[in-house]
Amino acid sequence: AGFAGDDAPRAVFPSIVGRPRHTGVMVGMGQKDAYVGDEAQSKRGILTLKYPIEHGIVSNWDDMEKIWHHTFYNELRVSPDEHPVLLTEAPLNPKANREKMTQIMFETFNVPAMYVAIQAVLSLYASGRTTGIVLDSGDGVSHTVPIYEGYALPHAILRLDLAGRDLTDCLMKILTERGYSFTTSAEREIVRDMKEKLAYVALDYEQELETAKSSSAVEKSYELPDGQVITIGAERFRCPEVLFQPSLVGMEAAGIHETTYNSIMKCDVDIRKDLYGNIVLSGGTTMFPGIADRMSKEITALAPSSMKIKVVAPPERKYSVWIGGSILASLSTFQQMWITKGEYDESGPSIVHRKCF
């Protein structure tokens, strides 16, 4: 979260709400009934953590409201009734969800104006393009979204329920097989950190496995909070390999390369060349070293042999959805696009389908 026109978000925190497991254990602590974001994270030992966004789609509105409240009042320290708000949504977000978001913004937070934009479209804007295909992979879900002249093509959007959280799970499982125990929500965060710091994508998986067997070149060590040191080798690339081979964790889905290809093939034959030449990676789960080269190699193998293929992995892609939003909301041409409170009062939540597409 942050302000339009800024080049980076002011606040970045996990979408988590934590509630005390046992009430009133801590005497004189003035215990809150709920903690949000980093505070929930740091007190996770005594809390039960909930994720109100599942697979990119809001599933628990009470907790989501807490997160928004926390964003306005504690993180950005603004009064929401004084600022227009740009929200983002997952591709193919159900209609009822868009309406609910709109309703909460106008009725609970009293915003003067708001707009809902599709995440992948914002990432594409942030890369300086209006046509291309975005592979957006975050914590809960991945999507491939073909976009032509600024508009997402809904019939060709594909969703893959495989993303950062699954890779963390996979690494937890691999480490458990090796005799380490990571089970609680607190320990999962340690494994996530390990994944972010050490994992990478192999250009050739089989060959990398051979290398890992015969040498210690891929081994790296990681210090746990209690001082114990773990050494991980092949695990470093076995975990993100799941993005290309979901069958490794028993999923029947196509990998991210094949899903991207399938998405392009659902588009009109005349625009495919523009899509192949503008494949943009976005989201935290595309931050692994080596992912762009591997993606390029895999798509080249699937595409027609004469096709020029370009995979773009902007360094700021972890936040490119936010950056695209900052750009969009600052444009003078965008100012007529906002849904105003007056329009909402007149038409109700369904106005969002007429004004945001």
Swiss-Prot record:
Compartments where found: Cytoplasm, Cytoskeleton
Enzyme's top EC category: hydrolase
CDD domains given in the database record: ASKHA_NBD_actin
GO CC annotation: actin cytoskeleton; cytoplasm
Membrane-spanning segments: none
EC number: 3.6.4.-
Keyword NADP: no
Reaction it catalyzes: ATP + H2O = ADP + phosphate + H(+)
Key word Transferase present: no
UniProt entry keywords in alphabetical sequence: ATP-binding, Cytoplasm, Cytoskeleton, Hydrolase, Nucleotide-binding
Single GO MF descriptor: ATP binding
Gene3D superfamilies named in the record: 3.30.420.40, Actin, Chain A, domain 4
Pfam families in UniProt: Actin
Main location: cytoplasm
Protein family: Belongs to the actin family.
Leftover remarks: There are at least 13 actin genes in potato.
Protein purpose: Actins are highly conserved proteins that are involved in various types of cell motility and are ubiquitously expressed in all eukaryotic cells. Essential component of cell cytoskeleton; plays an important role in cytoplasmic streaming, cell shape determination, cell division, organelle movement and extension growth.
Protein name (database record): Actin-100
Source organism: Solanum tuberosum (Potato)
